[in-house]
């Protein structure tokens, strides 16, 4: 049986046809080209069917190990594509950047639909109170529009968290998305969906609302709409504004800033972005936050009090703004008070926010009025110069009065005691002023010492470190030069030690010539004069 006919799980026809694989060797005389051992469309299915062995139907009779390896690689690539896991670092970075952009767009769309739902809710509430009723078709249409925007918002929130889970998988190299679904993440997603799902549903639903009036303490019963309880929590959707600010912040999107923050163990979140904005433009942030909170709280108080305020004091928008303003500033005149627990709760939160904003305003104003470090240095320098001049003037006054006292007591024939007492008085005043200025100058020196903050100390330490590093480098260079000089001195010393021997050898007289010895004849002398000369003759001639 051919190894490509059955794989244990998928049955194929073994007859001739498009789906059949060749089981016999191809006939070269049939006029048809030889078929491949298996079709490309069945590679993934056949890859792990049986161990690789030579195929008898192969036109060349080669084993199928190479084809099986290629099938395994294709299976692995298919599994990577199916799991969404990139194949290398470049693909992972590109996929991560694309997920970042998709998450940013989803956050923008979620904020747009969330704000759209709030605007339509406020419009429907105001129109249903003064223009038409809750039973009208216009109210039903606006509520349907709110429900549609809420459904789209919920879908966008789900997609946003799906992108976040994909980013978690890419960053941590996870293969299963359920790894990222911790209990905390599930709770936060559920809470966010619950907050975004609150909205006034289409229809007219009422309930009995009982309250006690503020000054008369008389009970007040009214038939209120359920939309009041479902409309006010819609302002919780404004948390999406902080998410959009974070995702669009240059600090969050800049790779260099994120790298530096990671090295310094800084988490880039909404809190960090708000701190940065409070450092850059604190006045603008406080102004926008205060005005927004003021308007939202005033409208909420108006909606809460409209069913029990028969005199239209707090149910009027201007009256509600006055109540919120005096509560925000912690004044509390008492001319206007809320009747319902809803209005009292809003006023309580307004008072807490007002206390916090007041503290922030005081801190911001104090920081703005404080001199900078450069201004402090300039101010201290100018004060020191003025004090130095005043001390010099006081010393000159002391010398002048001393001379005048001496002049009017010793250099005149008849001293004028009144003038002498006058100059003595000025003399004592000059001495006292000089002593006082010296003490003031000492205090000024203490202020200068206090002006050296931790930043100045850190800067001084950095400068000292640079100086020490430079001195260390110069010291190493000097040591290298000294080592080179020492080696040269050693060589020069060795040369000087060998110099006497060379001089003695140069001035030594040559030895006297030796007397000739009688003996050999001319042939022996010729042989002795060239004993090492070689000629291509018999060896006996050299011996």
Swiss-Prot record:
Residues 317-337 dip into the membrane without crossing it. It catalyses: K(+)(in) = K(+)(out). Residues 1-92, 505-543 are annotated as: Disordered. One of its GO terms (cellular component) is synapse. Keywords: Calmodulin-binding, Cytoplasm, Ion channel, Ion transport, Membrane, Transmembrane, Transmembrane helix, Transport. SUPFAM superfamilies: Small-conductance potassium channel, Voltage-gated potassium channels. It is found in: Membrane; Cytoplasm, Myofibril, Sarcomere, Z line. InterPro entries: CaM-bd_dom, CaM-bd_dom_sf, K_chnl_Ca-activ_SK, K_chnl_dom. GO terms for molecular function: calcium-activated potassium channel activity; calmodulin binding; inward rectifier potassium channel activity; small conductance calcium-activated potassium channel activity. Homodimer. Heteromultimer with KCNN2 and KCNN3. The complex is composed of 4 channel subunits each of which binds to a calmodulin subunit which regulates the channel activity through calcium-binding. Interacts with calmodulin. This is Small conductance calcium-activated potassium channel protein 1. The lineage of its organism: Eukaryota, Metazoa, Chordata, Craniata, Vertebrata. The gene is KCNN1.
